[in-house]
Amino acid sequence: MGLKSDAWIRKMSHEKAMIVPFAEEQVGRGVVSYGVSSYGYDIRVGDEFKIFTNIGGTVVDPKNFDEKNVVDFKGDVCIVPPNSFALARTIEYFNMPDNVLAICLGKSTYARCGIIVNVTPFEPGFKGHITIEISNTTPLPAKIYANEGIAQVLFIEGDEPCEVTYADKKGKYQAQEGITLPRILK
C-alpha cells in the first residue's frame, strides 16, 4: 500500500504493460530527464502539440470547445507563446491497475523556467495516452522539447479496491490516443 517504488513500477510495466514504451532507467544526459526514478516515472512529451491562439477571437468554453482556439504543430521543439498554453500527449501509453491512482507533477527543469505542467490524476482502470496541459507563465516565448521528459508520475496503491474504476464507468477519456480536447458527455 502507499507510494510505489522503482522496483514495483518496473515489475508492473514488464508483467502488466502498465507503461508502454517503458524506459528502464533514468535517462538524463543532454535531455530533460525521463524514465523510471526512485518513486516515480518521468514521462515524455510527444512531438504533436495544440497551441492556443487568439486568431479565431472566440472564448474558451470547456462545455463547447471550439477547435479554432488551437493550431496544430508537429516538431522536435514547440515554442509556446508568452502567457499562452499548449496541449500535448505522452509518448507512453498507460494501463492503470484497478487499485492504483497516479498523480502527475511538473518537472522542476521546466518549472524553474516559468513553464507549468498540469495533468489530472490517472484513475484506477484508466487506459490511454495522457493529454498534457502546458502553461507558459512568462512574458517570453518558451521551448518544449519533444521526446524528452515533461512531468513525473507517482503511483499510489489503495488500501482497498475502489467500487467503480474509470473503465467501469466508461470514462469519457478512456483509451484516448493523441491529444484529446475537452469533452462533455451529453
From Swiss-Prot:
CDD domains in the cross-refs: trimeric_dUTPase
Q: GO:BP terms for this protein?
A: dUMP biosynthetic process; dUTP biosynthetic process; nucleobase-containing small molecule interconversion
Q: Could you tell me what reaction this enzyme catalyses?
A: dCTP + H2O + H(+) = dUTP + NH4(+)
Presence of keyword Lipid biosynthesis: no
Q: Which GO terms describe its molecular function?
A: dCTP deaminase activity; nucleotide binding
What is the annotated role of this protein in its UniProt record? Catalyzes the deamination of dCTP to dUTP.
Q: How does it assemble?
A: Homotrimer.
* Family the UniProt entry places it in: Belongs to the dCTP deaminase family.
| Official protein name in the record | dCTP deaminase
Question: What species was this sequence derived from?
Answer: Campylobacter curvus (strain 525.92)
Q: Which gene encodes it?
A: dcd
